[in-house]
Swiss-Prot record:
Signal peptide: none annotated. The keyword Lyase does not apply. This is Anamorsin homolog. [4Fe-4S] cluster binds at C224, C227, C235, C238. Keywords: 2Fe-2S, 4Fe-4S, Cytoplasm, Iron, Iron-sulfur, Metal-binding, Mitochondrion. Monomer. Belongs to the anamorsin family. The keyword Cytoplasm applies. GO terms for molecular function: 2 iron, 2 sulfur cluster binding; 4 iron, 4 sulfur cluster binding; electron transfer activity; metal ion binding; S-adenosylmethionine-dependent methyltransferase activity. Its main location: cytoplasm. Component of the cytosolic iron-sulfur (Fe-S) protein assembly (CIA) machinery. Required for the maturation of extramitochondrial Fe-S proteins. Part of an electron transfer chain functioning in an early step of cytosolic Fe-S biogenesis, facilitating the de novo assembly of a [4Fe-4S] cluster on the cytosolic Fe-S scaffold complex. Electrons are transferred from NADPH via a FAD- and FMN-containing diflavin oxidoreductase. Residues 184-198 are annotated as: Fe-S binding site A.
Length: 263
């Protein structure tokens, strides 16, 4: 397997050019394979993929450096390999080195640069150098994700902390006093018990004193002056509630069916 490859579109390749390629590739001259009249190969190079470390293309006509030939040079080069393209120096109106740089860039090469014109065998020529990427198609590498560290919270131990026990006073800690529940009987008809302490016995005594007597019925007397106007004007403790309106001093008489059921 050759360490370097030299191609040209001419019939022969100068020995000096082969020596320059060997020096650039850091190999001996015997390790350099030479292909002449590369245009006759139809753009195909009889080498395996990534098999040579450097390629020297001596091109007399820039049109010979076609896209297919550039792709083949890139195919046979190893990852990180270099390619050198030599062509006759351009005249003032022609710039073939610019076309070569563009073709190499379009072919996937990197670090494309042209050197100053040099003279070989009384012929001015320029050299365009380029490099194949150091990675190959299908290669992969893990991505290192940078994780942002959480900001550290500075806690000041000297800061004043509130004691929750100090928020309650002695009054708050005392057991609340429940309201006194009436100790009398409960039910539909509540009555004061014998030892009443809730005040129900006193209330019943006051109500008992308000019961109507025969004298009050025969000679009604109003303390507020509204008893004879009817229930709409009588107070809540009026003894005449339920009786029809009457005039002061008028005898109150009830019909015979007053206490009879309506049904």
């Amino acid at each position: 397997m050759s360490a370097a490859l030299a191609v040209t579109d001419e019939v022969a390749l100068p020995i000096r050019a082969v020596g320059d390629l060997a020096a650039a590739a850091e190999v001996s001259r015997e390790e350099v394979a030479v292909i002449t009249q590369c245009a006759a190969l139809g753009g195909k190079l009889p080498f395996e993929d990534a098999s040579v470390g450097a390629v020297l293309a001596v091109i007399k006509n820039v049109e010979s450096l076609r896209e297919q030939l550039v792709a083949e040079i890139r195919r046979v080069l190893k990852a990180g390999g270099r390619v050198l393209v030599q062509s006759p120096a351009p005249s003032s109106s022609q710039k073939p080195n610019t076309d070569i740089e563009r073709k190499l860039l379009m072919g996937g090469f990197a670090e494309v640069q042209s050197s100053a014109a040099s003279s070989q065998d009384s012929v001015q020529s320029v050299t365009v150098k380029a490099k194949k990427a150091s990675w190959s198609m299908g290669s992969s590498f893990p991505l290192k994700k940078t994780t942002k560290a959480l900001p550290k919270i500075q806690i000041d131990d000297d800061s004043d902390l509130i004691d929750e026990d100090s928020l309650l006073t002695e009054e708050d800690l005392k057991k609340p006093q429940l309201p006194v529940v009436g100790d009398c009987e409960v039910g539909a008809a509540k009555k004061a018990c014998k030892n009443c302490t809730c005040g129900r016995a006193e209330a019943e005594e006051k109500v008992g004193k308000l019961e109507l007597t025969a004298e009050q019925i025969n000679n009604p007397q109003s303390a507020c002056g509204s008893c004879g106007l009817g229930d709409a004007f009588r107070c809540g403790t009026c003894p005449y509630r339920g009786l029809p309106p009457f005039k002061p001093g008028e005898k109150v008489s009830l019909s015979g069916n007053f206490l009879a059921a309506d049904i």
